[in-house]
Amino acid sequence: MRSWMLAVVVLFAVPCIASGASKDPAKLVATHGYAYMSFSKGGQDVLVVSPVGSRREIRIDLAADVPPVAKMQAIGDWLPAGSYRVTGWGPLTWKDGPTFEIKPGRVTDLGDYVGVDVGGYKTVMLPIAHPDRQEAVAAASRSFASTLVDPAPIPAGSMALSPAMERPGINTGLGLVADLLIAHDRKINKPSTLNALLAAKDPDAFLGLVRTVTLPTQEEPASLPDGTLYFPADFGQLRKRSPDGHWSNVGMDTLRQITAVEAHDGRLLTGSDDGHIRESRDGGTTWNEVAALGSKQSVLDIDHADGYWLVTTLENTDPFKEGAIRVPSPLAVFPIVPRTVRLRILMARQADLADLKLAREFAMDINEMWAWPGPQSQLVNGQYYVLAGNTPQRLDLASGQWKAIPPRARTSTLRVNPRTGVVSALWGQGAFSKVYYSNDQGDTWQQIGRPPYVIWDLQMDTATSGWASRWNVNAFSGVWELYSFSPKKNDWDHVGDAPFNCKPLRVSAEVPVLCMSRDSSIFSLRDGKWNVEFSAQ
């Protein structure tokens, strides 16, 4: 309950970002220039700049009209001619930020940055050089290009790593007691700082280090016959785990987040959050693009069996007004504008995916989706299972028929054991949580006892054995607990705890339970003891 309250407190504490008034470029070009900046992996909704030598703050919070790419945020605004310095990114103070010049009737490109969490509640802004940057800047100014004195943008100055920016504590607005609770929680749960990242001064060296410590972003890896696992990760990486627990990296020429991976017949296929599918036939040394599905379609799953390729993508369609960042109401718990999430399942028979086509689309209202973890797609015994919102769906590959297989009105998580075919479903709702399993591919369900809440993951391996993790909330912190199903008691036994600030991840019954720490270290559970497999320190 306390974690839910904490989430509500944080939600209400998020500052409201006002959209700037629309401006007529034709009336401004004589005295103003346009400043453009982008953040490849999302932003803070506002860039704060100040005239050089002045403490006056100017907020740039208008969305630039550029082609959408996954979570990228692009902003720009008209500023009076003069010299400026970037002084803030949302609530973060950007010390010694980059300086730039604004000239009448010109566009100034401030560059592209990625905010990187380096631990200890600190963020470093990493400048990124893109080969197609000029095209993005041109797109941002296309609507008013005819009014410009010179269409060539003024390039960004020296783009350097920012100093580590301290993320401030939350001012809840709910009084002193609430603020003290949040501050204490923040203090005792402070993650370790990645000192190697803080020591890096060169952007290329910093990026190289970031790629080596990025954690898996998906729970389903690609598995080789010898037990080697490939996990999707951020910054164009796959985290490779050998059977003996050694971790290394396989990378490709992209900074996007890799969100899916599959291994088949000596090939590795990956999907990214900007809709690209790539393949490697040499273990990840070289990569070729197989398909481009659209820059707003995240590829969340790639599966193969019996001559079928299945690809699951997710696309958000938001009624977003071009030229302004949508501002949530401070009194609304849910988004004030309905958002439709389109989950698409694509199918192909050819190895090169040339015949990839839509098999099914689910249009889901995000306001009706409760704690959705993603589609959790799995291909097992000729059946493709997908959690579409809160409803489990199953595709029979042989017949091409879809069937909804809900054990109840809503489902929070869906798991299928690839060896036994047992399906498990969880509805997480505190004391009202429900657990079900099925031995017949979801046609019928049996309800069993549940672990203590808050339940995060639950996997039944057979009708009489299973594993679960829960977040046990203490007074000012919490611990991840592990549970094993006891059929005699129809209940769950507490069998251990995860290390501090470490989230458990279970691939299967055949792989040791892993744990991903907030400082990017990785542990494994062997013979009841946690062992360090990868240290980011």
Where does each model-flagged region fall?
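Primarily secretory-pathway and cell-envelope proteins
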Residues: 19-64, 89-212, 219-223, 291, ...
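A short, solvent-exposed beta-strand micro-motif common in secreted/extracellular proteins
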Residues: 80-91
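Beta-strand-rich domains and repeat architectures in extracellular enzymes and scaffolds
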Residues: 204-236, 256-259
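Repeated scaffold domains used in trafficking and secretory/extracellular systems
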Residues: 214-222, 255-263, 296-305, 363-379, ...
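Entry beta-strands of beta-propeller and related beta-repeat scaffolds
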Residues: 226-230, 266-269, 307-311, 381-385, ...
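Loop/turn residues immediately N-terminal
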Residues: 234-238, 273-277, 316-317, 389-393, ...
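Conserved Ser/Thr-centered positions that define the repeating blades of beta-propeller domains
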Residues: 240-242, 280-281, 346-351, 394-396, ...
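Short, solvent-exposed loop/turn segments at conserved positions within beta-propeller repeat blades
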Residues: 320-321, 325-327, 335-341, 387, ...
